[in-house]
Amino acid sequence: MRKLITLAMLALTSIAWGADTNEAPVGFGLWNSAHLKEVGDRLEKELGDKRIVYETLGTYKGHSVYLVLRGKTAPAEFHETESDLQIGVRGKATFVIGGELVNPQKLPRKQQQGSSIKGGAKFPVGPGDIIHVPVAVPHVLLIEPNKPYMYILVKLDEEPRNDPPK
């Protein structure tokens, strides 16, 4: 009898260990290509004559992930505490980094904007290109008229947002 109980317990333990444990841990995020295409197509419909539209893909402690579509060149920017990682998805643009902000203005969340950048290095960017923007370095994406540029943006050490999530 003792052998039977031991075997039964071993069998139940094996079944329990073999149970489906495919639950992702808290904080895990996966945005597959089909989802990114769906969101990207929707953003293209929303863009119209706007400068930028985006969708927040995930928000985590200290960083967030966005899918961004730029339709026009925005003001140059500078983040006092955040760094950015950008991965090109669709279209082409020119990325300018370094130099000095022209007419800088302080913004909330420890950021600054300027009308342009004086100096700076220019790089053509497109799908698959990865850009790392260090903390406290001016940068801007130059967008050609009627040629939007889409990219995944990971904001690292992001200052808390006060606006409602999209």
Predicted regions and their residues:
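A short hydrophobic beta-strand segment most commonly corresponding to one strand
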Residues: 146-164
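Conserved metal-binding segment of the jelly-roll/cupin
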Residues: 124-145
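A short, N-terminal "cap"/entry segment at the start of jelly-roll beta-barrel domains
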Residues: 17-78, 164-166
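Conserved short histidine dyad/triad with adjacent acidic residue
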Residues: 62-84, 89-92, 96-102
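A generic "binding-loop/recognition-motif" signal
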Residues: 71, 81, 137-138, 147
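Bacterial N-terminal signal peptides
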Residues: 6-15
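Positively charged n-region of N-terminal signal peptides that target proteins for export
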Residues: 1-4
